[in-house]
Amino acid sequence: MDETIYKIPESVLVVIYTPQREVLLIRRADAGTWQSVTGSKDHGAETWAETAIREVQEETGLDAQHPECHLQDWQLENVYDIYPAWRWRYHPEVSRNTERVFGLRLPQKMPITLSPSEHTEWQWLDWQAAADHCFSASNAEAILMLPRYLSEPAP
C-alpha cells in the first residue's frame, strides 16, 4: 500500500500590497524567481482563506488577520498544468493545479521575515514593475488587476 503523502493540487496566490500600489515580491530559494506568496492547502478541509492566512504567515511573517490589514478573496481561480519539475510532489494521476487568488492590503510597507528554506530575498516594487518581475504569468496578471481592488473600500 502506497502511503506517500502528496501535495493537494489546490493552492493560493496572495498579492500583498499597500494603498500606494506597492507590491511585495519574494525570491524563491529553489528557482531564484520572483513571486507573490503562494502555497498549497495542507489538508482537504482547509479553506482557501485559511490557506492564504497560513501561507502569508509562513512565507513573510505577516499576520493577515491584523486589524489594520485587509485580506480579500478576489474570487478568481487559475487552473494550470503543473510544471514537470514539480510533478513528483503530486499524485501520479495529477497534472493540473487550481490556484485561488487573494489580495492582502497592508496600511504601509512592513518589514518581512522570510522562511529561508523557501525564499532568499524580498522587495517592495511599484505594481507595474512587480508584474514585470514575476516568473508566473498568472501572478503578473493578478498584480495588474490591483487598481480595480484598490478602488473598493475595506469593510
Language-model segments: residues:
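Conserved N-terminal beta-strand and adjoining loop/helix that marks the start
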Residues: D2-V23, G44
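NUDIX/MutT-family hydrolases
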Residues: R100-L106, I112-I143
